[in-house]
From Swiss-Prot:
Residues 1-21 form the signal peptide. GO terms for cellular component: cell surface; endoplasmic reticulum; endoplasmic reticulum lumen. Disulfide bonds join C65-C68, C176-C179, C529-C532. It catalyses: Catalyzes the rearrangement of -S-S- bonds in proteins. It is found in: Endoplasmic reticulum lumen. It is an enzyme of class 5 (isomerase). This is Probable protein disulfide-isomerase A4. It comes from the Eukaryota. It comes from Caenorhabditis elegans. Residues 22-139, 138-254, 480-609 form the Thioredoxin domain. One of its GO terms (molecular function) is protein disulfide isomerase activity. Belongs to the protein disulfide isomerase family. A motif (Prevents secretion from ER) lies at residues 615-618.
Length: 618
């Protein structure tokens, strides 16, 4: 019995010690440091504090962050005027808390109410704004405003687009960190646009569920944002915070062509380094004005300087007639080989005709190509680009213009052959030059010709080592004679490619895809594309199924991020699938159906030449 009593006493002693230890630990967890009225939270005390204080606003910050430093005194002042604690977490130290609450930037404020949350703080960043936001939400009668961002699905998407003139749509994935960061800003923008009476509507699509919509709109990453105006889609290239979204979309809602009441307004509007398009109209109810306005809307993202005037003084200065629509070339790039402007005036003007006119004459004989204007001013082929230290700012203009004049002398000789010429800054396009093998060419001027065929023809630095005009003249003769060699971006061809799906790279594209003895189905993919990854197993399954029954059809794939394909195989999103039947290699057929095996079989059956004949069994 003595042993039993001693053993029992020992157990009791251990239990008491454990309880005291636990109590001591709890006391440590509830020991919070205060800094100017703000509670300092750490990974150790965070959960205990929230358990004791179920309503709290927490600021996640970084000591080096400028916005955090600006917010700090306002946050401290607000802490003494609100009815709940304000707390802060140094997320550069408490990294686990940062990961737990998916903190993407600084400062990020999170709000808990009655133990529920967190919700993102989207109020002001001053004392009054913080106090107002917090007190409104801790009010027992507070009800959050209804969500203004419309959730779109396959069922309601078309109606929403057709019923609203201007829409911004976000395609997102629930797991995407950037999407989560955008969400409160996007909703805040929608709320404020509504309050302003704006006609702009904001919508969102969960592209992981609405896969057909994602495919239709070329979604290859998240978030992807598209502007849809009167049914036509455009990429959204604006900011991703509320104020920026509001300003960008408000600008988008204004007429694309600016009204210029007086001559002085027109003069100020003229661009020094880009084309300016001015419509001269006696009245705004003419067919020409309507066509001009429609075309301006279609070209809103391409031409930022489009305006119209009715001022007689402006008509007189530029010798314009009513309904003249004039493209003015920037004075910086005038030359004696071309007019300073081009005029369009047709009795039955149409927006389609104007679009063609604008694009045909969107750049001077030799303008400056930049990353900003390359996709709008310099899409017409063949295009000859001369890369050097092209800087037309006042300090370096004379030297840059000297070399441009050399290019002009050659360019004017090829106007009749429809060649378009441009100069470009070699530093701005350093990556592109490196990809073409010209990153360390040793030449002061590098030249690349972008051909009709979609191929790129770099001037070989080992062959052309003279002066610019001499090199360019000789290289253009080589281009015209068809003797220049094209550069093809290509990953190494696989040494062992015995799988059911053939791997195509730039260097073996012609051999595999343009094989006239085979019909070829080719998928263009990106390694990071989720849709491509989910489709891969189905594609392999289809290839295996057809290997024995359809020996004259080849299923292939190509990583379009590291390989060049001919221009007729245009890739705008991932995955993109083309069918190149025998005899029709120059006109491949783009597949636009579901990524379903039976649908793909039907597609190939319909278009097959060497395969899927009537005698073949599916």
């Amino acid at each position: 019995m003595m042993f039993d009593r001693r053993f029992f006493a020992l157990v009791v002693l251990l239990c008491v010690s454990a309880v005291r230890s636990t109590e001591d630990a709890s006391d440590d967890e509830l020991n919070y440091e205060m800094d100017e009225g703000v509670v300092v939270l750490t990974d150790k005390n965070f959960d205990a504090f929230l358990k004791k204080n179920p309503s709290v606003l927490v600021k996640f910050y970084a000591p080096w962050c400028g916005h955090c430093k600006h917010l700090a005194p306002e946050y401290e002042k607000a802490s003494s005027k609100v009815s709940i604690p304000l707390a802060k977490v140094d997320a550069t130290v408490e990294t686990e808390l940062g990961k737990r609450f998916e903190i993407q930037g600084y400062p990020t404020l999170k709000f808990w109410k009655d133990g529920k949350g967190p919700n993102d703080y989207d109020g002001g960043r001053d004392e009054a704004g913080i106090v107002e936001w917090v007190e409104s939400r801790v009010d027992p009668n507070y009800k959050p405003p209804p969500e203004e961002v419309v959730t779109l699905t396959t069922e309601n998407f078309d109606d929403f687009i057709s019923n609203n003139e201007l829409v911004l749509v976000e395609f997102y994935a629930p797991w995407c960190g950037h999407c989560k960061k955008l969400a409160p800003e996007y909703e805040k923008a929608a709320q404020k646009l509504k309050a302003q009476g704006s006609k702009v509507k904001l919508g969102k699509v969960d592209a992981t569920i609405e896969k057909d919509l994602g495919t239709k709109y070329g979604v290859s990453g998240y978030p992807t944002m598209k502007i849809i105006r009167n049914g036509r889609r455009f990429d959204y290239n604006g900011p991703r915070e509320a104020a920026g979204i509001i300003k960008y979309m408000t600008d988008q809602s204004k007429p694309a062509a600016k009204k210029l009441p007086k001559l002085k307004d027109v003069e100020r509007f003229m661009s020094k380094d880009d084309v300016t398009i001015i419509g001269f109209f006696a009245t705004e109810d003419s067919t020409a004005f309507e066509a001009f306005s429609d075309s301006a809307e279609m070209l809103r993202e391409e031409f930022k300087t489009m305006g119209h005037t009715s001022d007689p003084a402006a008509f007189k200065k530029w010798d314009a007639k009513p309904n003249d629509i004039i493209i003015f070339y920037p004075s910086l790039f005038h030359s004696k080989f071309e007019p300073k402007s081009r005029t369009y005036n047709k009795a039955a003007a149409t927006s389609e005709d104007l679009l063609a006119f604008f694009r045909e004459h969107s750049a001077p004989l030799v303008g400056k190509m930049t990353k900003k204007n390359a996709a709008t001013r310099y899409t017409k082929k063949p295009l000859v680009v001369v890369y050097y230290n092209a800087d037309f700012s006042v300090q370096y203009r004379e030297g840059s213009e000297y070399w441009r004049s050399k290019v002009l002398n050659i360019a004017q000789k090829y106007q009749k052959d429809k060649y378009k010429f441009a100069v470009a800054d070699e530093e701005e396009f350093a990556k592109e030059l490196e990809e073409l093998g010209l990153g360390d060419s040793g030449l002061e001027h590098n030249v690349v010709v972008f051909g009709y065929d979609g191929k790129k023809y770099p001037m070989n630095p080992d062959e052309f080592d003279g002066e610019l005009d001499e090199n360019l003249e000789a290289f253009m003769k080589q281009i015209s004679s068809g003797k220049a060699k094209a550069h093809v971006k290509s990953a190494p061809a696989p040494k062992d490619d015995k799988g059911p799906v053939k791997t195509v790279v730039g260097s073996n594209f012609d051999k595999i895809v343009n094989d006239e003895s085979k019909d070829v189905l080719i998928e263009f993919y990106a390694p990071w594309c989720g849709h491509c990854k989910s489709f891969e197993s189905k594609y392999v399954e289809l290839a295996q199924a057809l290997k024995k029954t359809q020996p004259n059809v080849v299923l292939a794939k190509m990583d379009a991020t590291i390989n060049d394909a001919p221009s007729q195989f245009a890739v705008e999103g991932f995955p993109t699938i083309y069918f190149a039947p025998a005899g029709k290699k120059s006109e491949p057929i783009k597949y636009s159906g579901n990524r379903d095996l039976e649908d793909l079989k039907k597609f190939m059956t319909k278009h097959g030449v060497k395969s899927f004949q009537k005698k073949d069994e599916l």
